[in-house]
Amino acid sequence: MVAKPPVMSFHFAQDLWPEQNIKDSFQKVTLRRYGKCEYENLQLRKGCKHVDECTGHKGGHNTVNQCLTATPSKIFQCNKYVKVFDKFSNSNRYKRRHTGNKHFKCKECSKSFCVLSQLTQHRRIHTRVNSYKCEECGKAFNWFSTLTKHKRIHTGEKPYKCEECGKAFNQSSQLTRHKIIHTEEKPNKCEECGKAFKQASHLTIHKIIHTGEKPYKYEECGKVFSQSSHLTTQKILHTGENLYKCKECGKAFNLFSNLTNHKRIHAGEKPYKCKECGRAFNISSNLNKQEKIHTGGKLNKCEECDKAFNRSLKLTAHKKILMEEKPYKCEECGKVFNQFSTLTRHKIIHTGEKPYKCKECGKAFNQSSNLTEHKKIHTAEKSYKCEECGKAFNQHSNLINHRKIYSGEKPYKCEECGKAFNRSSTLTRHKKIHTGEKPYKCEECDRAFSQSSNLTEHKKIHTGEKPYKCEECGKAFNRFSTLTKHKRIHTGEKPYKCEECGKAFNQSYQLTRHKIVHTKEKLNKCEEFGKAFKQSSHRTIHKIIHTGEKPYKCEEHGKVFNQSSNLTTQKIIHTGENLYKFEEHGKAFNLFSNITNHKIIYTGEKPHKCEECGKAYNRFSNLTIHKRIHTGEKPYQCAECGKAFNCSSTLNRHKIIHTGEKPYKCKECGKAFNLSSTLTAHKKIHTGEKPYKCEECGKAFNQSSNLTTHKKIHTSEKPYKCEECGKSFNQFSSLNIHKIIHTGEKPYKCGDYGRAFNLSSNLTTHKKIHTGEKPYKCEYGKT
């Protein structure tokens, strides 16, 4: 018995295709359902020419449905493509997609849709009706299908499996996207620039680059986005909510994609492999970066200057710089920007708004990326490890920057002076040296900075905020980086090693400074006198000698300094706090440099040797001063009397002769001194402390300098020779005193009678005649 043949519904909007095409097109689809029917048994009848002729259709939606249900089969054809539908509504919907007609418009935002169901779904964005709630985590959704997909996160269910490689996915769309990897097919081509994409959605996103359209706005912060997914991500960042937790280590993430990437660290999974070199990666973006290394990575070329970029967005930004197009203006200060995102970030400077708050410590940030970085301080997780040296980092970007130390790669070059950098951010900072731009101003003291981070750190001076505390000794710091460096004092860690001599340092800048010792290179020249320095910082300090500028003032007693480090040292002297303890004999010091110097004295180590005479020193600074004896160089000149000195400390001591200032007072006896070191030495008279002992004869001294002088008695060493008469001395100060005999110079003058002396000690003794002071008492009572 032959089955009853299918009959076409009388109600359809399209004309039937020619009869000769039935066998080729229609039969294939229809016979899936009616397999037993022969081609000749299919009876097709032509009904109304247009849907408007159908009385059932005019009767309303329900009448049409009844009519369609009554027919044995409901098959409708699309004119553009041979496609078969079992519902009249599906045929109409499909036709609208080809024509591009969008009759259904949203009253809220004017967005149009070609299908009513799409408009209905879209409306829920405005109404925020989240009817479907997840029982596992409480998260609500406005579509049931989204809830179903979400549940798979908790269950781990992945029903969609790739037949090619066996990889499974929790959504069919992910499987479809994945399959394209195997085919390498890129059917979706951009008509504007010719770039091809594997997915149509990627092409849609790409097109926005050309149009610049950003239809998705976040009402909370006013930020606009080109993609709805970016808006969703932004909302999550504002809430700070971390819903996705790693079962392996307990770390939580605000995005599921971040959790997926994180899991690969534990599993060691690296699914993204480079075909060029075979290197594998756990994140697709890292593979993209690697591929660009092989290709030269700069596919987007500027037609104006031939400069190439590895990202089209960078090319767009570059073009605006050439055109000097800056359409986004700040209404507050009038500054213009070539990107809207840059303007948005800039506005926060004026408002002081910090919407991103850390739940752990309450600290707030003006950018979500800063909050993300800050959170890692609390977790202390360092997932990214350097294969070269084993050092671990909490951010992948930090690891990439760290690797450049070994490769020596510096891809970012300054067009102004040619200097190259390994980070684009460092180049951006460097450029401000040429422009002199300092857009970040302190409201407290009007001081301006070229970087916002510098302003943030500066503000802590006014507030006194020190959020980073050392668990070892309790000392607090206003910067996390300073705390990290401080911790190395306790651990003794010295990660920066010199390849030339093997010497290790606890800070990178110390290693950089040290390397210059081997090269003997002096690139930084003083324009005033032509003197050259190995370090630019030394040249900067040297310049202050010529200008006499002292911008750093101590509020305690008004003393001014030419270096911030000197002011810091001064403050510590005022507090009298001794944080650094020498474990060998328990002595404490107020400065880390003092304990370091003390250790060298204790061990007797003298690593810095003079090539001229072979004399060795425990400090490099002492060697530098010593070398001036051979060269006769005296760069520090007194503005008052013109006398020159070979070290700044001697000049500072000399200046006090003219001012008569004695700011350092002994609490025990009230005696005042012009130098803090003299006060320290004086205090030992009261305590009787003599920590510096001679190994030769056992004699003890209250000052290390006295011990050094004493040792020369045993060695009979007299390295300081008078050029006038040939007499030798064991101390440089003794040679200076001796020289006065030849010059007849008497720089120390009595203010009472005008009598002059060649030694300050003689002037001090003379003054006691006027004051009647007799500080030295005989045990038997006579003074």
From Swiss-Prot:
Statement: the UniProt record of this protein carries the keyword Transcription: yes
Cross-linked residues, Glycyl lysine isopeptide (Lys-Gly) (interchain with G-Cter in SUMO2): 186
Record localization: Nucleus
Keywords: DNA-binding, Isopeptide bond, Metal-binding, Nucleus, Repeat, Transcription, Transcription regulation, Ubl conjugation, Zinc, Zinc-finger
GO biological process terms, semicolon-separated: regulation of transcription by RNA polymerase II
Tissues/organs with expression: Expressed in brain, heart, skeletal muscle, kidney and pancreas. Weakly expressed in aorta, liver and lung.
Major localization listed first in the record, in broad terms: nucleus
Family: Belongs to the krueppel C2H2-type zinc-finger protein family.
Phylogenetic classification of the source organism: Eukaryota, Metazoa, Chordata, Craniata, Vertebrata
ZnF bounds (C2H2-type): 76-98, 104-126, 132-154, 160-182, 188-210, 216-238, 244-266, 272-294, 300-322, 328-350, 356-378, 384-406, 412-434, 440-462, 468-490, 496-518, 524-546, 552-574, 580-602, 608-630, 636-658, 664-686, 692-714, 720-742, 748-770
Keyword rRNA-binding recorded: no
Cysteine pairs bridged by disulfides in the record: none
Family matches, as PROSITE patterns: ZINC_FINGER_C2H2_1, ZINC_FINGER_C2H2_2
Record's function text: May be involved in transcriptional regulation.
Protein's name in the database: Zinc finger protein 107
InterPro entries found in the cross-reference section: Zinc_finger, Znf_C2H2_sf, Znf_C2H2_type
A GO-annotated cellular component: nucleus
Pfam families: zf-C2H2 (PF00096)
GO terms assigned for molecular function: DNA binding; zinc ion binding
